[in-house]
Amino acid sequence: MTTKHITIYALMIALTVALSLTVLIPVPATNGFVTLCEAGIYTTASLFGPLGGLTVGAASGLLIDLISGYPQWAIFSFLIHGLQGLISGYFAKKSTTSWLIGLVLGTFVMVIGYLFAGWFLYGWPSGIASIPGNMIQNIV
């Protein structure tokens, strides 16, 4: 990883966090929120591959939760969004079909990850309640 990549990843993390904090929609049923962080994660993964997706996904997911007052989700967001960025970045450069498969798999990882994180923190009803919001968050 070069200094140039570190600088670009840092800028993408900052942009993703700023965008997410600008559009932050609380979801009382899950004790969480919906943001636009996927835009930054998928953009970085598409442009810079799996390492960029992993770095921006993990760091921005963690920072968004800590800054917005949801620290209980921070470690889960670090892991889930990092894996989401890694997977989507892995498939991004191969072909258009592969890129779309990466987006679908990244969405699946995020939705299932937060289903289990919600279950761990608050029980199954919270985990299940997170599915529609997380699907919308990924589609937007």
Protein language model features and the residues they cover:
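Loop-helix junctions at membrane interfaces
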Residues: M1-V140
